[in-house]
């Protein structure tokens, strides 16, 4: 009787040669990643087909074996996409599940596929391909939301509303200018995803476990086949690098922050106390007890869900911060964070695009709010500087005194009489009242990047051209 262990009872037929027994059930549960990394099936099969083609081109595989592998992998792909593929936990991950099924389909040639390859570089290329695709999806989602904000900006280029600091009225601005602020934020988000995509577009396949391989492989061939610009230059870095995932999460977190900020504004603006916007029935819900309620649940949920994206970034940074080179099993914890962040961000982008596209601004409420709260006080101070040659600090003091008087009277600055103003400074003239109107205030803000309606229209046209939407 042989003392050799039965391969069927070993830990895993793919790596169990030195093991006499299989893992504990709890170890198997900890170790298995198929429950989440099966999402990489398309990338895994694509990478394997490119690897097999390269091995054949280099004479490492026969053309017959390479053809059988390629066709077998397409069969596996079809089975998975049909929804009936029997993923097996004991095979741990997507790589082993695909290879095991390939062996069932084509037999011995399947065992040759892993020549000059390790799961370390295999998962690195699979994951990089997936994240690269997700960068493209995020860019498309961001551009759709930018267009929704641009439509609002064009429609409301001259609608006056209050600009806020500390959530208190500061100065009049235009609705269009406020919408364009989010276009600018989203443009930076788009740029971050584009930058991250460009940086991650190097192929780690061929780094093998960590040291490269002695087989005469052509890494440039596989890199080109998979749409990468070049192969990675250091095999140690190739298998240990998760910067691409961290960059994706960082860009996602900043984008999520922007979505959450506008979601917060929608919650505030749609309240009865503000009445700045009306959200459509598509993005609101009612109450089971209060018939009058129309709750901004989509905005509230989006505001909360975006926190998950920030949490995912922190989680992966925490996983990676203490790892020596090269691969450690800790790195298996990278995918769930990225998958959840990507799903959450894409859902948030789609929901926000719908809400922005449907929302209706209440011009009357916006204008009324803009005209209250002494919003043109800065215009008055500027007038004192321009017309009376006061130092700005003196003009600031005079204006503050007038605000205090108006507040004591229970009125706004335009409601003070000329005589009351002249009691504070005798040089004030009748023409001061022209700068105290909110419409004149926003029209005067013509500096580059300012809120003047003509500026808003010009910026909206510029962004439409940059997005390829110009007429």
From Swiss-Prot:
Pathway: Amino-acid biosynthesis; L-arginine biosynthesis; L-arginine from L-ornithine and carbamoyl phosphate: step 3/3
Any one Gene Ontology molecular-function term assigned to this protein's record: argininosuccinate lyase activity
GO cellular component: cytosol
InterPro entries attached to this UniProt entry: Arg_succ_lyase_C (IPR029419), Argininosuccinate_lyase (IPR009049), Fumarase/histidase_N (IPR024083), Fumarate_lyase_CS (IPR020557), Fumarate_lyase_fam (IPR000362), Fumarate_lyase_N (IPR022761), L-Aspartase-like (IPR008948)
Main subcellular localisation: cytoplasm
GO BP terms: arginine biosynthetic process via ornithine; L-arginine biosynthetic process
EC annotation from Swiss-Prot or TrEMBL: 4.3.2.1
Presence of the UniProt keyword Nucleus in the record: no
Keywords linked to the UniProt accession: Amino-acid biosynthesis, Arginine biosynthesis, Cytoplasm, Lyase
Reactions the enzyme catalyzes: 2-(N(omega)-L-arginino)succinate = fumarate + L-arginine
Family annotation (CDD domains): Argininosuccinate_lyase
NCBIfam families cross-referenced by the UniProt entry: argH (TIGR00838)
Recorded family membership: Belongs to the lyase 1 family. Argininosuccinate lyase subfamily.
Protein name: Argininosuccinate lyase
Species whose genome carries this gene: Cereibacter sphaeroides (strain ATCC 17029 / ATH 2.4.9)
């Amino acid at each position: 009787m042989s003392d050799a262990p039965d391969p069927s009872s070993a830990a895993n037929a793919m790596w169990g040669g030195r093991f006499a027994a299989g893992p504990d059930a709890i170890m198997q549960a900890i170790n298995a990643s198929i429950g989440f990394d099966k999402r990489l099936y398309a990338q895994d099969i694509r990478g394997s087909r490119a690897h097999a083609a390269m091995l054949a081109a280099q004479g490492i595989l026969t053309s017959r074996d390479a053809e059988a592998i390629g066709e077998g992998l397409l069969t596996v792909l079809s089975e998975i996409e049909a929804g009936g593929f029997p993923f097996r936990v004991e095979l741990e991950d997507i790589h082993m599940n695909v290879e095991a099924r390939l062996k069932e389909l084509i037999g011995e040639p399947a065992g040759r596929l892993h020549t000059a390859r390790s799961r370390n570089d295999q998962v690195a290329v699979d994951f990089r391909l997936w994240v690269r695709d997700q960068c493209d999806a995020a860019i498309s989602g961001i551009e759709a939301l930018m267009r929704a904000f641009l439509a609002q900006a064009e429609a409301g280029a001259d609608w006056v509303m209050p600009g806020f600091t500390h959530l208190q009225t500061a100065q009049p601005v235009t609705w269009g200018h406020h919408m364009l602020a989010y276009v600018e934020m989203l443009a930076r988000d788009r740029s971050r995803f584009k930058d991250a995509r460009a940086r991650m577009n190097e192929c780690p396949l061929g780094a093998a476990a960590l040291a490269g391989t002695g087989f005469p492989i052509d890494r440039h061939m596989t890199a080109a086949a998979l749409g990468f610009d070049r192969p990675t230059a250091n095999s140690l870095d190739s298998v240990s690098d998760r910067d691409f995932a961290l960059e994706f999460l960082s860009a996602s977190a900043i984008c999520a922050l922007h979505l959450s900020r506008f979601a917060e504004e929608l919650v505030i603006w749609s309240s009865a106390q503000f009445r700045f916007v009306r959200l459509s029935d598509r993005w609101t819900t009612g109450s089971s007890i209060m018939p009058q309620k129309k709750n901004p649940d989509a905005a509230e949920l989006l505001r909360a869900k975006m926190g998950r994206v920030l949490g995912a970034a922190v989680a992966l940074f925490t996983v990676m911060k203490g790892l020596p080179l090269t691969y450690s099993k800790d790195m298996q914890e990278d995918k769930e964070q990225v998958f959840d962040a990507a799903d959450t961000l894409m859902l948030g982008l789609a929901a926000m695009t719908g809400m922005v596209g449907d929302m209706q601004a209440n011009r009357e409420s916006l204008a009324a709010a803009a005209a209250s709260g002494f919003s043109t006080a800065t215009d008055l101070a500027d007038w004192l500087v321009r017309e009376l040659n006061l130092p700005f600090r003196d003009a600031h003091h005079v204006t503050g005194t007038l605000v205090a008087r108006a507040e004591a009277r229970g009125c706004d600055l335009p409601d003070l009489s000329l005589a009351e103003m002249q009691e504070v400074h005798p040089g004030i003239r009748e023409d001061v009242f022209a700068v105290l109107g909110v419409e004149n205030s926003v029209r005067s803000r013509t500096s580059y990047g300012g809120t003047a309606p003509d500026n808003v229209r010009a910026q909206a046209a510029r962004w439409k051209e940059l997005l390829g939407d110009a007429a």
